[in-house]
């Protein structure tokens, strides 16, 4: 609800003066619109092994914090190597005795049930996701939860059609799959990983991120309600030691990891010489490229969405903006105007555009890299307005006059920070965009179809969006090149990474 601060003052137009620039907060005050649905959180969450919630063998727990308030949400079980072994053994038994013998048609029924049950509890899951991760409720509500359900629906449709995954070849499940997911999209990454593995006939041991385990464990409740046989899906929670134990366990035939490039390299080194199959979805430093014939207003919205969606906690975030010189000043001006109306604050407020940074450690990293950008001579602009006194927040930030050698142009910041560079020709844009260790995604804004086709061919990125950004669909494969990883997730191509061919 909006309230006019003062309707007694005569307007600028009435006084014959130019109308002032409208900035939220100058003329209007917005009442909070908090989400009030009960997330139904438990005080303590146990491990989910062999179809049951069980206490960790060590008896140890760690706290899950709300990044918007820094308050404890719940205690989470800390799994050790013995817990991981129990989970892997349960998954192997389930595969040998039940899941591996089921027809695709029967497996599909379970996946459909999970999708429908998730839809039934969508609002509850959205609130839990926002409280645990810090993202705005409108993103959890409108993207994360619906997309998670969509992945289960989509892969349920594939479960009885697997002969078409690789026509002319015989496909078979791998057995037990170990999966490790990040903290930026906890529920969606669960669905992203679980759905194709289960559709193909594999059993799973999944480790959520340490800071965002709650929605994975709530999903375990749905898995119980859906009646999945015990051991088909197992969740082990903990820190790096838990993940290392899972990666090193001899039972899983495949490792699926989404996270930082640094950790991905450690995992690959540890698995060198083994016969385990791997997919790695790692970091990114995506180029968002705007040509002078682009629809500028539409491009500005795409740029804002590309970098500030989920506080920039997105591996494919458009964190490097390349603008053709002739329109650079115009684009930067419009970006600043748009940033002035971004609302940063309580993630549970439906008006909020940018929520809380996921953890204190991530906030520290963002702050350090922004300071490096200032020190190296880039020109900084940050959105105005007050930040909440409590919680981990960072202002949406853009840097202009950035050089390719600057750290902010080379390193993944994983926060709401945009580096702006310019180019003159298409060839220069391609060369600069490809001058990175990463190759996950890119965006192109132009009116010319021929230019889009050439750019999508020349850019070394797994996904290229044209006149849009951050568009995802379960039917479309997602993955990168170079230090952004290998393998694909989603679509028919994603299923290939969860099977063996004969």
Positions of the model-derived regions?
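Residue-level signal for inorganic ion chemistry
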Residues: 70, 107, 129, 201, ...
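Conserved C-terminal structural/oligomerization subdomain of aldehyde/semialdehyde dehydrogenase
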Residues: 2-11, 69-74, 228, 252, ...
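Glycine-rich loop-to-alpha-helix module at the N-terminal edge of alpha/beta enzyme cores
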Residues: 71-162
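Structural signal for hydrophobic packing residues in well-ordered secondary-structure cores
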Residues: 95, 99, 115-122, 126, ...
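Hydrophobic face of amphipathic alpha-helices that form TPR/SEL1-like repeat modules
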Residues: 2-68, 155
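Rossmann-like NAD(P) dinucleotide-binding subdomain of oxidoreductase/dehydrogenase enzymes
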Residues: 161-298, 351, 423
């Amino acid at each position: 609800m909006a309230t006019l601060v003062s309707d007694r003052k005569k307007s600028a137009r009435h006084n014959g003066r130019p109308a002032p620039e409208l900035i939220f907060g100058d003329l209007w005050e917005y009442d909070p619109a908090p989400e009030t649905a009960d997330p139904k959180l438990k005080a303590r969450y146990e491990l989910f092994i062999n179809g049951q919630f069980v206490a960790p063998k060590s008896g140890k727990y760690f706290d899950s914090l709300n990044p918007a308030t820094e308050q404890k949400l719940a205690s989470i079980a800390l799994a050790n190597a013995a817990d991981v072994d129990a989970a892997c053994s349960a998954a192997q038994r389930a595969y040998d005795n039940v899941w591996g013998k089921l027809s695709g048609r029967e497996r599909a029924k379970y996946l459909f049930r999970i999708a429908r049950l998730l839809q039934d509890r969508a609002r509850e899951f959205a609130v839990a996701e926002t409280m645990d991760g810090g993202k705005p409720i409108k993103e959890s509500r409108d993207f994360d939860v619906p997309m998670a359900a969509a992945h289960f629906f989509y892969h349920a449709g594939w479960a009885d059609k697997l002969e078409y995954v690789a026509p002319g070849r015989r496909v078979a499940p791998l057995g037990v799959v170990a999966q490790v997911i990040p903290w930026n999209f906890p529920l969606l990454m669960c669905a992203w990983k679980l759905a194709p593995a289960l559709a193909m006939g594999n059993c799973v041991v999944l480790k959520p991120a340490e800071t965002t385990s709650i929605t994975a464990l709530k999903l375990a409740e749905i898995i119980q309600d859906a009646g999945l046989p015990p051991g088909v899906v197992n969740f082990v929670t903990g820190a790096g030691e838990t993940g290392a134990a899972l990666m090193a366990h001899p039972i899983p035939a495949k490792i699926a990891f989404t996270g930082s490039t640094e950790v991905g390299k450690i995992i690959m080194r540890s698995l060198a010489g083994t016969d385990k199959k791997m997919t790695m979805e790692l970091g990114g430093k995506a180029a968002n490229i705007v040509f002078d014939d682009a629809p500028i207003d539409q491009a500005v919205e795409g740029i804002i969405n590309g970098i500030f969606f989920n506080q920039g906690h997105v591996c494919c975030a458009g964190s490097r903006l390349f603008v053709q010189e002739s329109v650079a000043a115009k684009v930067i001006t419009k970006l600043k105007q748009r940033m002035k109306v971004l609302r940063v604050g309580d993630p549970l407020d439906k008006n909020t555009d940018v929520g809380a940074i996921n953890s204190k450690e991530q906030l520290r990293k963002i702050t350090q890299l922004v300071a490096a950008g200032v020190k190296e001579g880039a020109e900084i602009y940050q959105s105005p307005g007050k930040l909440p006194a409590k919680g981990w927040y960072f202002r949406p930030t853009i840097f202009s006059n950035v050089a390719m050698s600057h750290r902010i142009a080379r390193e993944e910041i994983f926060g709401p920070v945009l580096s702006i560079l310019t180019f003159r020709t298409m060839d220069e844009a391609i060369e600069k965009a490809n001058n990175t260790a990463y190759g996950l995604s890119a965006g192109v804004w132009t009116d010319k179809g021929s230019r889009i086709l050439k750019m999508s061919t020349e850019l070394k990125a797994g996904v290229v969006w044209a006149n849009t950004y951050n568009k995802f669909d379960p039917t479309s494969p997602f993955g990168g090149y170079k230090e952004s990883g290998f393998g694909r997730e989603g679509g028919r191509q994603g299923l290939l990474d969860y099977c063996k061919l004969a």
